């Protein structure tokens, strides 16, 4: 009986044990898979990448190339998250500047169609001017462009994936002014969203015609060029803990050893490093976020407890903040700006400053002194350019700033981002706001992935080693503008002067020979003179 009673339960226990082991292994596998998806899921997203060119100093913007019409005419367009229109100069414009490409020729495109309004009203509540639906756009700095609307085929060519093609209503410039007259890029690509009963924007049409993509786009810019990514963001670009490592040697951030070389578990370090900071958008159709503070050396320099509603704008070169906030930050930047390292009196005066002497005492005064001493020790000379903007020789010694978001998370804003490269110096890219509009511009975008999640109405930020695409690597095209230069303006003065001297001497010698010839003809006797006639 004992044997009979123990036999079956033993087999049942073994069976249950096997099932338990299988269940545990399955749960472990699912857990591992879940962790993998949480850290690597975004890398599985389908991403369409587009090269950006430009920089902050020379161009003051970043641009990409898009093909318009049939056959295609390439147009360079400034990437602008602060506006919604796609527009550029068209042939026949007499008030347009000289840009990278020839003005778009509607007659050369068999798919172009002007939006006329002679016999019917303009759609989207547009104005009818001289038989065409009017295009007009004003910008924060005061410039304005105007013309008429037309529609044509837009082809967006990805360097790593297939092209996306759709028909789009665009603006034809017939008048440009201010900055638009002198910019090198030909047009503007607005990246904000469509309003109800408004003209469908580029972003909405792109995702409508590429349903395989998530409705997320990312801007990742370095000192020279960068990328626009449609469909998500790229985890491979994210800065890993312990420093940053350039993407294919092209990044602009400080270079450090990789995670695997540091001896850490790459998966654990990745989870800690890959933390996208998300902030909800506060206005529909535009990319505004709430900023509650701006810290320098641990002290919030922002006076208002309400914070600021700031536009995340890739079309603005610099970050613009209220004047009182700017003055507080600038006071400490001025102290860190030592123009003459050999002036011992001036250097010692700065070193003897106490926290009590400041109108805004610093929470981390010791860090301020460390920064100042580091700048002095490394002889990080500073110069001032237009409007007193400080420029340092090196990045070393400059402080990190911290932007406080609505959830009180403090996001680091590093010197290699808020400073921009100008020749051999690094200049401050923060300015006083214009027209009471605070803006997070390109100096806030630089060296991070700025992720625009349209579906969830939020914007994400994460430090990144953004790829570099210098402008000289940009492919050439048949419709490039060929400047008809005055040849005399291209000749150096010495050669021009020499040509003038040679020309003058040639004219003078010609005159001399001409006069001599006249003299010879008038005063020299004819061969028959002085001789008697043959009959005589």
From Swiss-Prot:
During the asexual blood stage, plays an essential role in the export of several proteins into the host erythrocytes by cleaving the pentameric localization motif RxLxE/Q/D (termed Plasmodium export element (PEXEL)) located downstream of the N-terminal secretory signal sequence. Specifically, cleaves after the leucine residue in the RxLxE/Q/D (or RxLxxE) motif of exported proteins including EMP1. Also, by regulating protein export, plays an essential role in gametocyte development and thus parasite transmission to the mosquito vector. Residues 244-258 have a biased composition (Low complexity). Component of a complex composed of SPC25 and PMV; the interaction is mediated via the transmembrane domains. The complex interacts with the SEC61 channel-forming translocon complex and is involved in the recognition and import of PEXEL motif-containing proteins into the ER for subsequent export. One of its GO terms (biological process) is proteolysis. Residues 514-536 are cytoplasmic. It is an enzyme of class 3 (hydrolase). GO terms for cellular component: endoplasmic reticulum membrane. Its EC number is 3.4.23.-. It is found in: Endoplasmic reticulum membrane. Belongs to the peptidase A1 family. It is not clear if the zymogen has a cleavable propeptide. Cleavage of the putative propeptide is dispensable for catalytic activity. GO terms for molecular function: aspartic-type endopeptidase activity. Residues 244-264 are annotated as: Disordered. PANTHER family: ASPARTYL PROTEASES, PEPTIDASE A1 DOMAIN-CONTAINING PROTEIN. The keyword Hydrolase applies. It is a single-pass type I membrane protein. PROSITE patterns: ASP_PROTEASE, PEPTIDASE_A1. Keywords: Aspartyl protease, Disulfide bond, Endoplasmic reticulum, Hydrolase, Membrane, Protease, Signal, Transmembrane, Transmembrane helix. Residues 62-462 form the Peptidase A1 domain. The keyword Nucleotide-binding does not apply. This is Plasmepsin V. Residues 1-34 form the signal peptide. It comes from the Eukaryota. SUPFAM superfamilies: Acid proteases (SSF50630). Pfam families: Asp, TAXi_N. The chain crosses the membrane at residues 493-513.
